[in-house]
């Protein structure tokens, strides 16, 4: 039986001027883009080029929403019709007996810890860049926690559904603090900020029916196991702070 393979990456941040050419790799069918590729629709031509080379699975990061409402960005990408392109937003698609399950996920702020939520509201740029329902109202920590709940409840149904397919879960936000780079695990400020980037869902993911779980957002590479689930994060990063470990990583999905 052939092994399905995917080129996995996130956080290309094309809106900041990164120039990335996606190579064609023999034997690789899928390209998984785990969010923060660009801002709203600015990277549409990049997506079209990717879809000419691979079957593309794409989810939104937080940066795609900058300058727009949540609904505007979601509606745009739902409207995009490109061959070999699949946009997932609390949704899934089955290709070659693999169920790709996608969600931005967002974050639970250490289970709604008031101290973490206050810190996030002060230091996280999203709350001054992303609009909620209208252009007169920014998102808040409370509204993003509600987004997290919606995503979590969707994923709970999807990743525990024994429907016979191999499962690949793709989120933008992290779901385990194991993805936090060791250099960000000691200082108190880092420990506080980490809860703004990833939730602690180790048991939830590690005991699921997922084969591979992919995320972005952290800007440092990770590849480890949660139970029987392989976790992969392969971000590019900002132009002035590129991830030195980034490479064109190919992952076996089955």
How should these model regions be labeled?
Residues 1-59, 64-73, 134-137, 254:
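N-terminal active-site segment of His-dependent metallophosphoesterases
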Residues 2-3, 94, 181-187, 192-210, ...:
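Binuclear metal-dependent phosphoesterase catalytic core
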Residues 3-13, 97-105, 168-172, 230-236:
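Active-site-proximal beta-strand elements of phosphoester/diester hydrolases
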Residues 8-10, 31-36, 57-62, 86-90, ...:
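Active-site neighborhood of phospho(di)ester-bond hydrolases with catalytic His/Asp-centered motifs
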Residues 13-20, 38-44, 63-70, 92-94, ...:
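Active-site environment of divalent metal-dependent phosphoester hydrolases
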Residues 56-64, 69-132:
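A basic- and aromatic-enriched beta-loop-alpha substructure that forms the phosphate/nucleotide-
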Residues 81-85, 154-166, 203-213:
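A structural motif corresponding to the C-terminal end of an alpha-helix
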Residues 101-168, 173-192:
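Active-site-proximal loop/helix segment associated with metal-binding centers of metalloenzymes
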């Amino acid at each position: 039986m052939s092994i399905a393979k995917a080129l996995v990456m996130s956080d290309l941040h094309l809106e900041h001027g990164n120039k990335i050419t996606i190579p064609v790799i023999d034997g690789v069918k899928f390209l998984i883009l785990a969010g923060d590729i660009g801002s709203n629709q600015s990277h549409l031509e990049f997506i079209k080029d990717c879809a000419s080379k691979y079957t593309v699975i794409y989810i939104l990061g937080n940066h795609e929403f900058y300058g727009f409402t949540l609904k505007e960005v979601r509606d745009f990408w739902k409207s995009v019709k490109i061959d070999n392109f699949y946009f997932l937003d609390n949704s899934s698609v089955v290709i070659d007996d693999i169920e790709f399950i996608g969600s931005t996920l967002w974050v639970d702020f250490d289970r709604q810890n008031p101290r973490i939520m206050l810190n996030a509201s002060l230091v996280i740029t999203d709350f001054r860049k992303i609009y909620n329902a209208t252009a007169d109202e920014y998102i808040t920590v409370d509204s993003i926690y509600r987004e997290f709940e919606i995503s979590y409840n969707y994923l709970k149904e999807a990743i525990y559904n024994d429907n016979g397919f191999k499962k690949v879960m793709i989120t933008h936000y992290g779901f385990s603090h194991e993805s936090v780079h060791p250099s960000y695990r000691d200082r108190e400020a880092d420990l506080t900020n980490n809860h703004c980037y990833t939730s602690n869902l180790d048991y939830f993911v590690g005991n699921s029916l997922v084969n591979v779980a992919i995320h972005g957002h952290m800007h440092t590479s990770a590849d480890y196991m949660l139970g029987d689930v392989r976790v992969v994060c392969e971000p590019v990063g900002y132009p002035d702070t590129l991830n030195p470990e980034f490479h064109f990583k190919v992952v076996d999905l089955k």
